[in-house]
UniProtKB/Swiss-Prot annotation:
Gene: psbZ
Protein name (database record): Photosystem II reaction center protein Z
Species name: Glycine max (Soybean)
Subcellular location: Plastid, Chloroplast thylakoid membrane
GO cellular component, one term: chloroplast thylakoid membrane
SUPFAM superfamilies from the UniProt entry: PsbZ-like (SSF161055)
InterPro entries in alphabetical order: PSII_PsbZ, PSII_PsbZ_sf
Transmembrane region(s): 8-28, 41-61
Length: 62
């Protein structure tokens, strides 16, 4: 269970870093938002899911 928690935290950190870089780039580029809207929404949905997963796994470990 600890390994799953550590992998979930690592994935959350990795996705956070990717979104931190990619979202401003998408907003700054011309026509970037209309072309990459689905990618940003998918990344945000994945991030929200990982936040809940880390919370659930944390409550099971503690």
């Amino acid at each position: 269970m600890t390994i799953a928690f550590q992998l979930a935290v690592f994935a959350l950190i990795a996705i956070s870093f990717i979104l931190l870089i990619s979202v401003p780039v998408v907003f700054a580029s011309p026509e970037g938002w209309s072309n990459n809207k689905n990618v940003v929404f998918s990344g945000t949905s994945l991030w929200i899911g990982l936040v809940f997963l880390v919370g659930i796994l944390n409550s099971l470990i503690s």
